[in-house]
Regions:
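Basic, glycine/lysine-rich polyanion-binding surfaces/domains
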Residues: 3-177
């Protein structure tokens, strides 16, 4: 039985959507009702084409009133969203931020996260996110994952520090062997 697992999920893409129409635009992309989505909240969404066919199923993170990230497996959603926004006349900027994502999953992930960020990380609810710092590096941490266990995604905002973050988390997990 595994106790925790750290995965480099750099293959994941982040699509950043900002601008005055960002909230209206992300609602246009998915049939899921986002009207009550708060800043700091994450939602599992389905992106559909004009016929209702599923294009992708990312996690949507709301970082500000008009600031969103789509966190998805590799695909061309960035280009698709740019084309949809242009064609539909939305006032948004769509880009791919320089992010290095890691997943820390498993029953002991909470203890490891507390050793890294302190006890307040335990207050991060399922499918919520918050900006944090670790060793001078800016991260976005979400309580999401695929393991059916307690888990977190750590999205390092500057990919050049990815190896250092990975090693820091590995060291933090050693006492829990």
């Amino acid at each position: 039985m595994y106790k925790r697992q750290l995965c480099d999920v750099a293959v994941e893409r982040q699509v950043e959507i900002t601008g005055p129409d960002a909230a209206k635009f992300v609602q246009f992309l998915t049939p899921r009702d986002l009207s009550a989505m708060a800043v700091g909240q994450c939602k599992y969404v389905i992106l559909t084409n004009q016929h209702g066919g599923i294009l992708n199923d990312p996690v949507l993170l709301r970082l500000g009133a008009n600031h969103f990230w789509l966190s998805l497996a590799d695909s061309d959603v960035l280009f698709w969203a740019q084309g949809v926004a242009l064609n539909a006349g939305y006032d948004v900027t769509i880009s791919e931020p320089d992010v290095s994502p890691l997943q820390l999953q498993g029953p002991q992930s909470g203890k490891i996260m507390q050793s890294l960020f302190g006890s307040e990380i335990a207050d991060l609810n399922y499918y919520w996110c918050r900006p944090l710092q670790l060793d001078g590096s800016d991260l976005l941490v979400s309580r999401t994952g695929w393991s059916s266990e307690l888990g977190y995604e750590l999205l390092l905002r500057d990919s050049k520090d990815g190896n250092r973050l990975y090693e820091t988390i590995m060291q933090a997990g050693q006492p829990f062997d």
